[in-house]
Amino acid sequence: MCRCPLEHHEVRMTSAEAIAVAGSAQEHGRPKWPPDKPQVLGQPALARVVVAALVWLLAGASMSSLNKWIFTVHGFGRPLLLSALHMLAAAVACHWGAQRPVPHSIHRRVLLLSLTFGTSMACGNVGLSTVPLDLAQLATTTTPLFTLALSALLLGRRHHPLQFAAMGPLCLGAACSLAGELRAPPAGCGFLLVATCLRGFKSVQQSALLQEERLDAVTLLYATSLPSFCLLAGAALVLEAGAAPPLPPTDSRLWACVLLSCFLSVVYNLASFSLLALTSALTVHVLGNLTVVGNLILSRLLFGSHLSALSYVGIALTLSGMFLYHNCESVASWATRRGLWNRDQPGKGL
């Protein structure tokens, strides 16, 4: 986990974003970099972050592979319907767990999040149904770049300079991986690109509602799941009613996979919301790049996918960018000891 300075949000951290510092710096407008006394995440909060991250990574990798299995092996040609079922499962699961109603003052923000949530999920599943699993996962590695830009533009958050540097290998690695897998349909790649952009926007919205408005993960997921379900169910009814082949009602294996996919979706979304409440939108998506390796292995084992040499170079670059992002303070300290980085003069550095 990155040890960059953290925001004063009780036990919550903004990971490597360091958007707030102590009083005197606030009087002069934008906070200085770096803060004098960075906060350290307490052991209980750190344990919650680790558990939520592990659950999120495992559920995400399993759900992506299972969804691809449903689309490919069972011929389930209804990605919008599957997305709607995911949202319905979230609404049912969170109905009794929501702690309090959403304040009326933020209803519009919640509805906007629901629209972004549902659209990103639909585009992701539509893209996944048409392209190989490995390519679908590699496309998501550019999400941290969109999240970094949106958090700076929309929320005014400041980032460690090395975090911007880490976006280079992260996105270059994704570009190399995509260049090595150009056999995929252009339409599927387009849906994946839209889903990636919307996923970054969604995380910024979630982070603001969870941390600034103090909503809990279950309440926010419940509030967004019902509007998202209505949106996705309507889209599935209009776009997939006559286009996809009829569903086999007696295929017990298919419906068992669909139910398991819905369960994994609920677990994944709850863990994602919890991570956003404890860390930040950018940290979550950089962590999400870890699922790429797991899904590449599963894609090779389950579907016989093979990556080119350029794609493996892209994976190595992506992992190096992740290392730089999560260890920006350690890298900066190492460079400072060798005279390559001057903390007091941000203009002079690596």
From Swiss-Prot:
One example of a Gene Ontology biological process annotation: transmembrane transport
A Pfam family the protein falls into: TPT
Chain coiled-coil ranges: none
GO molecular function: antiporter activity
Subcellular location: Membrane
Superkingdom of this protein's organism: Eukaryota
SUPFAM superfamilies, sorted: Multidrug resistance efflux transporter EmrE (SSF103481)
Keywords: Membrane, Transmembrane, Transmembrane helix
Signal peptide, first to last residue: none
Topology term for the membrane: Multi-pass membrane protein
Transmembrane segments: 40-60, 79-99, 110-130, 135-155, 218-238, 258-278, 279-299, 301-321
GO CC entries: Golgi apparatus; membrane
Domain annotation EamA: ranges: 125-179
Family: Belongs to the TPT transporter family. SLC35E subfamily.
Known function: Putative transporter.
Protein name, per record: Solute carrier family 35 member E4
Organism: Rattus norvegicus (Rat)
Lineage summary: Eukaryota, Metazoa, Chordata, Craniata, Vertebrata
